[in-house]
């Protein structure tokens, strides 16, 4: 797909926007499992399927001919598994992403885990990610991106909420 240029960013989603947003997609975590654990499990399954191995039994009466054997995820993109970026909101999920060989996408959605200034926490998240990557023994170099959400102020209400004019706003 796209000549090997496709980069895919995924995460469990920003938790503050919708209460139990996963339910709107018919996902309900089993008893004793959090929505975050469910999302990580689904991600692990997805990563395995990206390797291109057959997993699904073909329909004996398909609309068009199938290749022999189990069917893989299509369209298949060689190397896409190495071009997956995990949007980590915590240090623990950054380390988890590193262990699984995903690239790290850090942003302003990082959760405050220590009360330290944001830039200190984000730098620590990246250090922990790189250490976990090294410990996992991956052959390739880890990739990290840092993004920041920017919102245009278009009216007086926006300015009232977001244009405080100090270092905090």
Predicted region positions:
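Flexible, glycine-rich active-site loops centered on histidine and acidic residues
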Residues: 1-55
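Conserved, mostly hydrophobic/aromatic
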Residues: 46, 97, 129
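C-terminal amphipathic alpha-helical "assembly" element
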Residues: 1, 7, 113-114, 119-123, ...
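Active-site glycine-rich loop that binds ribose-phosphate moieties when present
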Residues: 63-72
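A local structural motif
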Residues: 77-83
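A conserved active-site cap/scaffold subdomain adjacent to cofactor or substrate pockets
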Residues: 92-120
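Hydrophobic faces of well-ordered beta-strands that scaffold small-molecule active sites
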Residues: 6-10, 83-88, 102-107, 142-148
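Active-site-proximal loop/turn and secondary-structure-junction residues that shape catalytic pockets
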Residues: 12-16, 110, 148-152
């Amino acid at each position: 797909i796209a000549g090997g240029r496709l980069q895919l960013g995924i995460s469990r989603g920003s938790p503050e926007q919708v209460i139990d947003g996963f339910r709107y997609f018919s996902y309900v975590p089993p008893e004793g499992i959090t929505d975050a654990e469910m999302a990580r499990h689904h991600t692990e399954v997805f990563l395995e399927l990206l390797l291109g191995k057959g997993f699904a039994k073909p329909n004996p009466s398909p609309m068009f001919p199938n290749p022999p054997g189990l069917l893989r995820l299509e369209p298949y993109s060689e190397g896409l598994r190495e071009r997956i970026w995990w949007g980590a909101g915590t240090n623990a999920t950054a380390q988890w992403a590193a262990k699984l060989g995903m690239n790290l996408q850090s942003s302003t959605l990082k959760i405050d885990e220590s009360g330290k200034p944001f830039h200190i926490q984000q730098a620590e998240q990246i250090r922990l990610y790189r250490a976990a990557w090294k410990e996992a023994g991956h052959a390739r170099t880890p990739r990290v991106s840092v993004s920041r959400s920017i919102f245009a102020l278009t009216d007086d209400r926006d300015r009232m909420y977001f244009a405080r004019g100090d270092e905090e706003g």
